[in-house]
Each structure stands twice: as C-alpha cells, then as structure tokens.
C-alpha cells in the first residue's frame, strides 16, 4: 500500500514537472513570435580595409525600438556599421528599405539607424538592473547569421533563434553561453520565459566554449534617452 501511494506521488510529481516544462516551452515560443517581426537584417557596403574573407558586402542584425508616421528607429552595435555606406534593412525577405545612421557611441558600441518605413513592429526594452538573480536563466537571441561558403541560400529569409544561459553579470556586459556568430551582432537578447529584452548581442569571446557578451539594456536605454533629449523628444 505504501509503495502504491509513493508511486502515485512520484507519478504526480513527474506530471507536474512535465506540465511546467511545457509551459516554459510555450512561453519561449510566444516570446519568439512576439519579438521576431521587429528584428531586421542590416546589409551594407564596407571600405576595402574593413572587408573580411570573401564578402564584398557586410551584414549585421538590428531591431526596431521606435516607429511612427515619421519612420522607424533601429538599434544595432556601432562596430558592425563602422565606415559602412549604402545601408539597407530587410525584414523576413519581404520589406527592403534604406537606412541611415542618426546617432552612435563608440565607447558603448551602440548605433541608432533611421529608415523612412513607417509603423513597423517595435520591441519594448526591459531592464538589466535585476539580472543578478537571473544568472542561470535560459535566454534567447534572434538574429541573422551570415552564411558560410557552403550555405548561402538562407540569408535574409528568416531570423535564426540562438539559445543559451545567462552566465554572469559584469560591470558593463552580460556574459552569455551563446556562440554569437558573424551577422548576429546587434541582435536582441531576451529572457526565454518572459520575452523581456535585457541586452544586445555584441561579440563572441570563446567559440569552443560558446561564450559571448551582450550589452546591458540599461546602457542602451541611457543611450536612447540622451539622443531623445538632444533632439527635443
């Protein structure tokens, strides 16, 4: 009888755990579906001294942070667009539009672009002040990885989801277990279960160990606030 009760309890625990896992997966899927429409591919031309490998063009990821009748503002990292010209955005291989740099900060490695395309889906920024208690939590990144020479047919067709964990909070960076590949710089980094954007993908530190860094979103908000204040918004 005791064994039977214990077995039932164990079965209930397993069912509850499975239900929690399904709920977490559903939340992750919902987060991706909500954020994806605002993530854009940035394509550009770069000077010869900035060229890498065989590419004449350069690519990065950005995401819309504000939009209205005046156009749309897109956030990315400054190093990705440094010295670039002929900037364009693409969303899901459907919408193509020119863009220009309206603000940048080399120290923060942030840049703000503007496109004349109006009323695009945008992403609300979260907060990075509370993240110390979230170390170990699952995170996601939505970006446009640059294809290698063996796979160049999917570029610009769809965003790619990259998943990992928030592994450490540093003074001016979030350490993540994400292998941030070329093209994903500038992508939003978000908490899987809530979809809260807490950082911007910046660089890969260790390819073998899949260690990357993201800029804390509070630094991003400060950058945007200073831009708005300087322009009377």
Where are these regions (language model features)?
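A conserved glycine-rich beta-strand in the N-terminal activation segment of trypsin-fold
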Residues: 23-29, 45-74, 95-98, 186, ...
